[in-house]
Swiss-Prot record:
Residues 14-106 form the Core-binding (CB) domain. HAMAP family: Recomb_XerC_XerD (MF_01808). Keywords: Cell cycle, Cell division, Chromosome partition, Cytoplasm, DNA integration, DNA recombination, DNA-binding. The active site is at 182, 206, 282, 285, 308, 317 (o-(3'-phospho-dna)-tyrosine intermediate). This is Tyrosine recombinase XerC. It is found in: Cytoplasm. Gene3D superfamilies: 1.10.150.130, Intergrase catalytic core. Site-specific tyrosine recombinase, which acts by catalyzing the cutting and rejoining of the recombining DNA molecules. The XerC-XerD complex is essential to convert dimers of the bacterial chromosome into monomers to permit their segregation at cell division. It also contributes to the segregational stability of plasmids. It comes from Pelodictyon phaeoclathratiforme (strain DSM 5477 / BU-1). GO terms for cellular component: cytoplasm.
Amino acid sequence: MKDSSFTPSSTLFRGSTLPVADFLEKLSTLKNLSPNTVIAYRTDLFQFFSFLAQHLGLADLSLFDPEQVTTVEVRLFMAALIERGVRQRSIARKLASVKSFYRYLQESGHIRNSLFSALATPQYPKRVPGFLTEQQTEKFFNELLPQSAQGFRKPEKNELDESFICERDRSILELLYSSGLRISELIGLKVGELDLERGYVKLTGKGRKQRIVPVGQQAVDALKKYFEVRRNFFRMKRTGDAGELLHVFVTKSGKKLYPMLVQRLTRKYLTSVTDQKKKNPHLLRHTFATHLLNSGADLNSVSDMLGHSNLSTTEIYTHVTFERLKEVYRKAHPNA
């Protein structure tokens, strides 16, 4: 069940002095968090305070004192979320959001004491990400995809459209695996941020942090072919000059791609090679990281290429590579 419980009424914050808007603005401007992350914080806070209003019998928060919250209310909030089928990791994230807001209240002088300063956020083991094996990846990129990219989806109405979509999709998949992009980074990628001659891409990730990631030769070749077809496509369509397009990956009308389209095309193509439930762009990002570590890349370098701000985020992949090392050991060591 989705965690859309405790939707606040339009009058919930009427007369309230809680500086939620100021807190969210700080997250956006000073901490450079992405709009989606700020929205997640906002949703978490609104759900928490909506629950409190219901629990305390308040029509709005005009008379609410944030210091009156106790561990009892926090536990009841968690219990209510569990009852509604909210996942444990989502609950932990919501508590972390509330804890961060209360820390802001204390630092800005709105409250003197916060029970959240001594309240530990529940920690749950991170899921080991799914990935394609080296054999699956080789078969997909070197056999299935080159043979007939259009075989994965409904063909376009004419050869010109088909050629454009085919090469665009192929280069998207190649780049996702070659450089481990997030879907937002792929969609937002601009032509000037891609250097195919020197083989690298400049990415702007979470928190607007920039990084440079190598692009493999196979992806470079696919992108060069795509740009060639793209130029011809927009010239023949007479819908504008392809050189004027800002973004690398666009629709047939020249507009920037949207997330659902990339999710959909990735799922269709990857169905041919894996039966994993989540066949999304992140599967290729996980595959990128896992294959690098399997081939001996050091954790810090992989973390930099993924754009992780914390090395512990990258360490989840070491579980996968450790299992591979154990398999190699069992096969190679005489006393294994």
